[in-house]
């Protein structure tokens, strides 16, 4: 690996300090650190644009929490570059490597001794009339939800063109297995092992209590048509990118062509991470 991209929380002093040390460590090994220009200015360095990074990097290191990693994954998803997540945040389902483990993990990666978890992504589009007005890749989830003062949302749903139901709810979450421990979990959705290939539809506070989460095959295409008029409704992707929806908009969600490749610790298994992060067995 000759070039490694570094992503971090821009205004976090701790991330800035760790990034500076990491840059020095990489340069001592004749590896070119690629830092996005805005963050690079905080480090007193020159950088590259975020659009250039996917074509230049052989690997990426993310310093922060899951939100920072998810943002990097959407940027890099089209290239399937391995991403090493270092947890400097709080929960850290995806950034499972600790700061103490950073340099041993990097040494292992440079030596080719690392394990990669291939994570399914989603492609979400919004159609308005005959036009596609919004298109994005998603690692965790695509969420349709109402604004603070909006009433219940009516959404017609189809799977592979077949009518499923018309949801009356505060919103709807369409998630990947990776996203099952995110918003989906808070809405009483199932925890899905990240190695599985599937989509999950989870209603948010449905008006009908028999509307339960549904797990679909990975090849399924979920189509949602917004029926509600004059309501404040939004589509949010990974909790970071979104747009306001209008009555009649059609949202299509399907498996994306590319995946996110996460570098995982060989010393930890998924169930250990799950047990630790969710504090199972504690009183």
Swiss-Prot record:
Keyword DNA-binding tagged: no
Keyword Hydrolase: no
Cofactor: a divalent metal cation
GO cellular component terms given for this protein: cytoplasm
Reaction(s) this enzyme catalyzes, per UniProt: NAD(+) + ATP = ADP + NADP(+) + H(+)
Keywords on record: ATP-binding, Cytoplasm, Kinase, NAD, NADP, Nucleotide-binding, Transferase
Active-site annotation: 66 (proton acceptor)
EC number: 2.7.1.23
Task performed by this protein: Involved in the regulation of the intracellular balance of NAD and NADP, and is a key enzyme in the biosynthesis of NADP. Catalyzes specifically the phosphorylation on 2'-hydroxyl of the adenosine moiety of NAD to yield NADP.
Protein's name according to its UniProt entry: NAD kinase
Annotated source species: Geobacter metallireducens (strain ATCC 53774 / DSM 7210 / GS-15)
């Amino acid at each position: 690996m000759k070039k490694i991209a570094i992503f971090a929380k821009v205004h976090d002093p701790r991330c800035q300090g760790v990034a500076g040390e990491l840059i020095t460590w990489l340069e001592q090994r004749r590896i070119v650190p690629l830092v996005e220009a805005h963050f690079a200015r905080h480090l007193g360095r020159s950088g590259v644009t975020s659009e250039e990074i996917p074509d230049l990097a052989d690997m990426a290191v993310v310093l922060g929490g899951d939100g920072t990693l998810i943002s990097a994954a959407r940027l890099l998803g089209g290239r399937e570059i391995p991403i090493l997540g270092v947890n400097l945040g709080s929960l850290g389902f995806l950034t499972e490597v600790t700061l103490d483990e950073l340099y041993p993990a990097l040494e292992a990666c440079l030596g080719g001794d690392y394990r990669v978890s291939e994570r399914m992504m989603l492609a979400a589009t919004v159609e308005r009339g005959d036009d596609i007005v919004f298109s994005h890749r998603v690692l965790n989830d695509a969420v349709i939800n109402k604004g603070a003062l909006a009433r219940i949302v009516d959404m017609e749903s189809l799977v592979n063109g077949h009518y499923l139901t018309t949801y009356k709810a505060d919103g709807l979450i369409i998630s990947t297995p990776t996203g099952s421990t995110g918003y989906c979990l808070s809405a009483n959705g199932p925890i899905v092992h990240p190695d599985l290939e599937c989509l999950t539809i989870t209603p948010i506070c449905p008006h009908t209590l028999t509307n339960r989460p549904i797990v679909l095959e990975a090849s399924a295409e979920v189509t949602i048509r917004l029926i509600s008029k004059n309501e404040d409704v939004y589509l949010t992707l990974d909790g970071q990118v979104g747009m306001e929806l209008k009555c009649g908009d059609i949202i299509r969600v399907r498996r994306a062509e590319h995946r996110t490749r996460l570098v995982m610790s060989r010393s930890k298994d998924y169930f250990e991470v799950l047990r630790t992060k969710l504090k199972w067995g504690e009183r």
